[in-house]
Structures are given as structure tokens and as C-alpha cells.
A protein has these predicted regions:
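Short amphipathic alpha-helical segments
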Residues: 48, 52, 98, 102, ...
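Short glycine-/small-residue-rich flexible loop motifs, especially phosphate/cofactor-binding loops
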Residues: 26, 107, 346-347
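Intrinsically disordered, low-structural-confidence terminal and linker regions
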Residues: 1-14
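Active-site neighborhood of thiol-dependent amide/isopeptide-bond enzymes
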Residues: 72-141
Length: 375
């Protein structure tokens, strides 16, 4: 039987060299605004522990947007997820990507800082909340990290920042839960199996074998019942660059558009932001979460004790979809902008997400599904 917090068979993750060097890792730390002054001379002193892993994840999803603009505003209409291209796009240019780019960058950077980690893959659920799941193929990337020295205790990390993204590491344990962006949101892990699976624990048990994990998000509401949704399922197998590249090609070429058309039919852009002190106090009081301060924040849904640090500060989300820009804080959503032209959209991308699309590149979106009125 699999032990709580461990990979199957008690497997250990070995120390694996990063594809980024110390200078690149130091530049990444500076770009995401990790506290301190970093260079190739001192990045080897980074303390690769669980709390710092949490801070790195949160800083990444604040610094970089979950976005697919390269699919539509470039002549090649592709999403380059190679290691050199990701460094240039994120660290040099300050732009973003979707999960393959975000988590590949994060994996290689935390390896450069001394973490033991590998990447796996998941199946996105496209069904709405409170309904049976509708899983795609393996089109999502997740990370497994063993941040404790001399231990094989394992945490799941997703630093992609899209949708109702998880915002801190979560223990690989059935029933583990963590607070989401704010106290009104919770993420949980459940180990289960698909009802259509051919596998079972023992003959004629009629119980599906628990061979996959599911990340579930729960949202409280001010005016209605709590909603629950399976975000994705994943397995513990290690996946590699070629696996992600094949899935990536299927997405940006539209080969899978009949099953998943979100990125082909839309400009998608989302990014987390830090709540102000006033917003923080309001969220903590409103959600009556003060009694959860003593629970473990990585497995029992505890609320980090509010000390004005970035580890304890809640997050909000900005989301650009269709022709609207929305700001989400806890249970509240505010429409900031409504736009109808490409000039308006690229102005919003620049102002709110730091993504600079040259006016000359607008010609590349002409005739594509998400195109708006062009100059």
C-alpha cells in the first residue's frame, strides 16, 4: 500500500542537473523578485526547502502570465517550449506561456537551486462544476518535488498560474488540502480510478483501482452553495520533453480543436496579483478562517498566519477572456474593461500583463478565430 506523502513503492527523486546555469537561475530569481541580491556567486547558497518552494511558486505565478499570445500574434503561430526559448520569453522579455512553458521553466529553475524534482502529466477536465468529469488526453504538466533533505516525502507543484490555479505545494496524500488564492478557495487531492477503468484492487471487488490522482477545487459563494470541480487528473509516471512537445503541437496547430478549442479560438491571459493589506484583512475576517492558523498549510488546508509576508499574503486573479478583463478577489468579481478591437486588446495586454504586442504584429491574427476588429 502506498504510504501517505510518498510516491508509489517509496520511490526517491534523485538530484538531476538543470538545463539552466547558475547565472540564469540568479536572473530568474531577480525577475520574479525573490528577496535578496542574486548572482552566480551566491545562488548556490539558496536554501532549497519547502517554505522557499512555496514562495518560488507564488512569485512565479505573480510574475508571469498564463497566456497564449504567441499562437496568434506571430508569423509562426506556435508556442515554443524549448528550454532556451522559455528563458528568453520569461526571464528576458517578461512574457508568459501556458502550462508546458510555465512548469518546464519552473522545473529547470528549481533544479538549478538544488531541489529534487521531476515532471508528470495530467488530463484536463473540461466539464463544469458539480458535474461528471470529461477528461482530455495528457495536455497538462505537473511537478513532483521532494524538498526535505534526506526524505522522500513528496509534494505536487503546479506553477502554471492558469484558471483556479493551485497556489502552494500540496502533499501527495489522499485527502490532502491547501488554501487556494484566498480563504474562499480550497484545493484537495483525491486518489481514485476512472469508472470505465479495466483495473481493480482485487478480483470482483467492483471498486476501481486507485491509480490516478485528481486535483479538486472548491469555491465558496456569497449568494449560493459551494461549488466543486475536478480541475485535472494525473499519474505519477515521469514524462519528458518529447511527451510535452507532442501535446504542445496538437494544441497550437489546432489538431485537437474538436476536443479542446480554448487556445485555438481565444486569446487567453491570466495572472495572479498580491492583495493589499486592506483586502487581506477583509478576506480573513469575512471567511472566518482565523481558527485554521494552526493547521498544516501544505496538507490540512491551514491558513498561513498573517504576518505581512508574501508567504502568508493572499492572491487575486486577473483574467482576460473573450472581450472582457476581469479582476477576481475571493468571492468577488469585477469587470475592469470591455474591448472590441485589437488595438484595445493589445493595450490591455501591455498595461495589465506586461505583454507588449507590436502593432505591426496584428496582421498575424487576421482571419484567425479570436481576431477582433483590426486597424
Amino acid at each position: 500500500m502506498q504510504q501517505d506523502g510518498q510516491l508509489r513503492d517509496g520511490l526517491w527523486i534523485k538530484q538531476t542537473p538543470s538545463l539552466y546555469n547558475k547565472t540564469q537561475a540568479a536572473n530568474w530569481l531577480s525577475r520574479i523578485k525573490y528577496p535578496g541580491s542574486w548572482s552566480e556567486d551566491n545562488v548556490g547558497d539558496f536554501e532549497a526547502d519547502l517554505d522557499n518552494l512555496c514562495l518560488l511558486q507564488r512569485l512565479q505565478i505573480v510574475a508571469f502570465a498564463f497566456e497564449n499570445t504567441a499562437m496568434h500574434y506571430t508569423s509562426h503561430h506556435s508556442m515554443d517550449i524549448s528550454v532556451p526559448a522559455l528563458y528568453r520569453r520569461f526571464v528576458v522579455e517578461g512574457k508568459g506561456s501556458y502550462c508546458f512553458g510555465q512548469n518546464t521553466l519552473f522545473l529547470q529553475m528549481i533544479r538549478a537551486l538544488g531541489y529534487r524534482a521531476y515532471s508528470g502529466s495530467g488530463r484536463i477536465n473540461t466539464a463544469p462544476a458539480d458535474s461528471p468529469p470529461n477528461f482530455l488526453s495528457f495536455v497538462h504538466e505537473v511537478l513532483f518535488v521532494q524538498p526535505l533533505k534526506g526524505s522522500n516525502i513528496t509534494y505536487v507543484v503546479d506553477a502554471s498560474g492558469g484558471g483556479s490555479c493551485i497556489t502552494r505545494p500540496i502533499l501527495l496524500k489522499n485527502g490532502a488540502k491547501v488554501m487556494g488564492a484566498s480563504p474562499s478557495e480550497c484545493h484537495a487531492l483525491v486518489k481514485t480510478g476512472r469508472v470505465e477503468s479495466s483495473l481493480e484492487q482485487i478480483p470482483n471487488s467492483k471498486e476501481p483501482a486507485g491509480v490516478e490522482w485528481r486535483l479538486i477545487v472548491t469555491h465558496a459563494s456569497d449568494s449560493g452553495p459551494t461549488s466543486t470541480r475536478i480541475m485535472y487528473s494525473f499519474i505519477e509516471d515521469e514524462f519528458f520533453d518529447m511527451d510535452y512537445e507532442c501535446s504542445n503541437i496538437g494544441i497550437y496547430t489546432g489538431a485537437w480543436a474538436e476536443k479542446e478549442s480554448l487556445f485555438m479560438n481565444n486569446i487567453v491571459c491570466a495572472r495572479c496579483f498580491w492583495l493589499s493589506d486592506e483586502e487581506m484583512e477583509a478576506e480573513l475576517v469575512k471567511n472566518s478562517m482565523l481558527e485554521t492558523f494552526e493547521c498544516d498549510v501544505y496538507s490540512a488546508g491551514g491558513t498561513p498566519r498573517w504576518d505581512h509576508s508574501l508567504r502568508s499574503r493572499c492572491l487575486g486573479r486577473l483574467g482576460l477572456y473573450a472581450n472582457e478583463l476581469k479582476r477576481h478577489v475571493g468571492t468577488r468579481t469585477e469587470t475592469l474593461k470591455v474591448f472590441h478591437t485589437e488595438m484595445e486588446r493589445i493595450a490591455i495586454l501591455r498595461e495589465f500583463f506586461g505583454i507588449d504586442i507590436a502593432q505591426a504584429d496584428l496582421k498575424h491574427i487576421r482571419g484567425r478565430p479570436p481576431a477582433l476588429e483590426l486597424p
